Design a protein with these regions (language model features):
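Bacterial signal peptide processing site
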Residues: 24-26
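Auxiliary, metal-adjacent structural segments of Zn-dependent hydrolase domains
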Residues: 342-408, 417-418
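Post-HExxH zinc-binding segment in Zn-dependent metallohydrolases
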Residues: 325, 329-330, 437, 442-484, ...
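Catalytic glutamate of the conserved HExxH
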Residues: 423, 427, 431, 435
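A well-structured
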Residues: 76-351, 520, 587
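C-terminal motif of bacterial Sec signal peptides marking the signal peptidase cleavage site
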Residues: 18-22
Length: 621
């Protein structure tokens, strides 16, 4: 029985790691503050973790007779009239052409701006030249995003994998070029006029001295080394081959699709034993390069660089550390108590085919107002989403933006069960934000507020399209996921803090594994006797490799989402109203947006106690 309990715990934990690390809006790629309508780079590749099948209990209980699925009440729909206005004519995603972008156009456009500034040309001459720079920038990142999406749609497609790796390395050069353009404008006699008419408040002061440039030649070289290491990581996890105890070599993901119970567990041990040392070395090399980036940019360490430059957070690493300690105090004990009941592991997520999923999603968004419904139908009309299951797809879900077309794209790794509803809702929250706001500048913490809040709002709108049993399961599953998210993402955040606080020369695969194992113990998601395996599970967290210091965003931003949910529970419609008001935001930052909406800061005294009390009432009564 103990081994079966371990198996259930491991499978659920690994699945949770896969689900929670696969929900990013966009990556922390090297970028500069974008001029109006600038595009984004694509989202990262989260952990490659398959969907497990647990061995059945030796004393199975009879399955209850399924309740009939209610027929949804049809709701009127008005054809969307949105005109996106991108520089390229919008076509369905699968008809969008791909062509490797050249930087010649961007270089020529930047040179033309410099010549016009030197010649003292008026703003009316310079504005279209700056627009040409933005167009070239958008074209590059649109192709970057398309290559990423298509490499995720078929991870065996070597063409798009190579294209994405090439453009990922080149992105540092693009950022350096754009930064030089901004300094050229900020150091010109027209700096103030350009700030007022074209750029953003504070632009002239920010770019008045190019000795403060972030993208030095040294930094670009380090970023390219980082990109090459990311490519090495992606190659390792794309299609791993494991050697079994009898010497047989098998494709890991293919074998997992067919394995069950103890065979599944044996494959896990084989994979982690063989790939942890390789991936750990890649990770250590990444940490060394990133610490060098921090020195190059004048930061004390990479954690400070990530908080200040990469994520532009409106809270400090010190505040984050205090928040993690509060999670240990108020959330971890509740997590341990709830998980000991076994209720979370016994939830049956059932099955959900693609057509029924589409019916459920369409019904849910139809009850969120015309704007949300229009956005969904526009997405479907132009096939700006991929919700289909395929064994060739990357095991992740994300949303990214196609700047040249002025539209987002939603990618989801479908599991074929009720969990697809919340996975879609999360990414559609990102999609809705990107669509409504044309991907206007915002911090990732704010972006996660919109995605996590929509997950919870969707739960409140499915009573006519799910059976009572399905809705109860989905509700409990989501609440358990939230509790796990607070605990596990906090552990991951502390893991990164410890690793990046260690002298890089003292890092080894054994040390990294030991740090992660100790945090598994401290945060309550480990099993005595299987320490060797638990210490190696961290290699499934793609954010460690591709988006360092992202994970703290999940628990911090979820506090805002929980406040929206509580409003909806107390007064139906109030939470949605608050959400839509926040969506049309006046601020790019999480705290300013939340406080302006009348919500509390996640860092206010007592906030985590309130979250724990709410979760206890829902999960333990």
């Amino acid at each position: 029985m103990r081994t079966q309990k371990l198996l259930a715990l491991l499978l659920a934990l690994i699945l949770c790691l896969s689900m929670m690390t696969g929900c990013a809006k966009k990556p922390v790629a090297p970028t500069v503050p974008a001029a109006p309508a600038a595009g984004d780079s694509p989202a990262p590749a989260p952990a490659s973790t398959p969907k497990p099948t647990a061995e059945p209990s030796p004393e199975p209980t009879p399955e209850p007779t399924p309740e009939p699925t209610p027929e949804p009440t049809p709701k009127p729909y008005v054809e969307p009239t949105s005109e996106r206005g991108g520089m390229w004519d919008l076509v369905p995603f699968d008809e969008m052409p791909y062509e490797r972008p050249s930087l010649d156009g961007l270089d020529a456009a930047i040179e033309a701006v410099g010549e016009a500034l030197d010649a003292g040309e008026p703003y009316e001459v310079i504005e279209p030249l700056l627009d040409a720079c933005d167009d070239a920038y958008n074209a590059f990142y649109t192709m970057y995003s398309i290559s990423f999406i298509r490499s995720c749609q078929d991870k065996t497609d070597e063409f798009y994998a190579d294209e994405y790796a090439y453009l990922d390395e080149l992105s540092a050069d693009v950022s350096q070029r754009m930064e030089k353009l901004y300094f050229r404008c900020g150091m010109s006699d027209m700096a103030q006029e350009l700030e007022e008419k074209y750029f953003w408040p504070g632009f002239a002061e920010e770019y008045a001295d190019d000795s403060n440039a972030f993208y030095s030649d040294e930094m670009v070289e380090l970023l390219q080394k980082d990109a090459n290491l990311v490519a090495d990581y992606r190659e390792l996890v794309a299609n791993p081959i494991v050697t079994l105890s009898d010497g047989t070599e098998v494709e890991y993901f293919t074998a997992l699709e067919e394995a069950e119970g103890f065979s599944y567990l044996s494959l896990l041990f084989a994979y982690y034993n063989q790939y942890n040392p390789q991936l750990a070395q890649v990770y250590i090399d990444m940490v060394k390069v990133r610490q060098q980036q921090a020195v190059s940019a004048g930061y004390a360490n990479y954690e400070e660089l990530a908080f200040d430059h990469s994520f532009e957070r409106d809270y400090s690493p010190e505040q984050a550390a205090e928040y993690l300690q509060a999670i240990k105090t108020y959330i971890v004990p509740l997590y341990k108590e709830y998980m000991d009941t076994g209720a979370y592991w016994s939830l049956d997520q059932g099955s959900l085919d693609a057509q029924r999923l589409e019916d459920i999603l369409r019904y849910g968004v139809s009850d969120m107002g015309q704007e949300v419904q229009d956005t969904y139908e526009f997405m479907v009309k132009y096939r700006l989403c991929d919700l289909e299951y395929s064994p060739k797809k990357s095991e992740m879900s994300f949303q990214t933006y196609l700047g040249a077309y002025e539209v987002p794209f939603l990618f989801m790794d479908s599991s074929g069960n009720l969990g697809d509803i919340t996975t879609f809702s999360h990414e559609f929250g990102h999609y809705l934000d990107g669509f409504v706001n044309y991907d206007a500048d915002e911090t990732l913490d704010l972006a996660e507020c919109f995605s996590q809040a929509l997950e919870l709002l969707m739960l409140t709108r499915l009573d006519e399209v799910l059976s009572p049993q399905e809705l109860d399961t989905l509700y409990k599953m989501k609440m358990g996921d939230i509790l796990s998210m607070y605990v596990q993402q906090a552990a991951f955040a502390e893991f990164e803090h410890i690793i990046y606080s260690t002298d890089p020369e003292d890092l080894s695969p054994e040390y990294v594994n030991q740090v992660f194992l100790q945090l598994c113990v401290d945060y309550g998601f480990s099993e005595a006797g299987f320490e060797d395996l638990y210490g190696k599970l961290w290699i499934d967290i793609s954010h460690f490799f591709e988006q360092p210091f992202y994970v703290i965003t999940y628990p911090v931003s979820h506090d805002i989402a929980m406040q929206v949910f509580q409003l909806e529970e107390e007064n139906p419609g109030a939470g949605l109203e608050k959400y839509l008001a926040m969506l049309h935001r006046d601020y790019p930052d999480m705290l300013d947006t939340a406080l302006n909406a009348g919500l509390e800061s996640p860092f206010d005294p007592g906030r985590l106690e309130k979250v724990a009390a709410t979760m206890r009432e829902i999960l333990l009564g």
